[in-house]
Regions:
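N-terminal capping/linker segments that flank leucine-rich repeat
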Residues: 1-19, 24-27
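Short, charge-rich binding segments
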Residues: 60-61, 70-75, 82, 91-94
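Ankyrin repeat structural motif
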Residues: 22-29, 76-84, 110-127, 151-153
Length: 153
């Protein structure tokens, strides 16, 4: 699916996160010290979108994304903590200027449980040092994204 060979381990980690597989994530992190801080070398573009789509969480990944980005999109605060403990960057920027906190407020939760997970994710990211006032390349802050998506997070 993903074309860049050196991204294979990171893609495997991102898939485990998207599948909410905490045991799988832990096992992958044990095998590679640098995986928590690795950045994706390739990602979705207008020409190549389908192969960079994580169906489980309805989310594209972009060049520069980290596992923390995907954990934020998947509303997995425990995984975010584990990644940051192993060097995962809480404020990494992808090619679109988006940081994990931008991803955490994307999408609309379909249940109270998902809404709670999203709130916890946002809280954990801010607690760990994510800047809620940072803008992406379009000048959008995480707060503005949350408002646009009508999120309570």
């Amino acid at each position: 699916m993903f074309a860049v060979q050196e991204d294979d381990a990171l893609i495997e980690l991102m898939r485990a996160i998207a599948q909410h597989d905490q045991a799988g994530v832990a096992a992958l992190l044990e095998t590679d010290d640098g995986l928590a801080s690795a950045r994706l070398n390739a990602g979705a573009t207008r020409q190549q979108a389908v192969e960079f789509f994580l169906t489980e969480i309805s989310h594209h990944v972009y060049q520069g994304d980290t596992a923390v980005h995907v954990a934020a999109a998947a509303s997995e605060p425990a995984i975010i903590r584990a990644l940051v403990e192993q060097g995962g960057p809480v404020d990494a920027t992808n090619r679109r200027g988006a940081r994990p906190l931008h991803y955490a407020v994307d999408g609309t939760p379909r249940s109270v449980q998902e809404q709670d997970a999203q709130r916890q994710t946002v809280s954990v990211l801010i607690e760990l040092g994510a800047d809620p006032n940072v803008t992406d390349k379009n000048g959008t802050t995480p707060l503005l994204r949350a408002i646009r998506n009508r999120n309570a997070a």
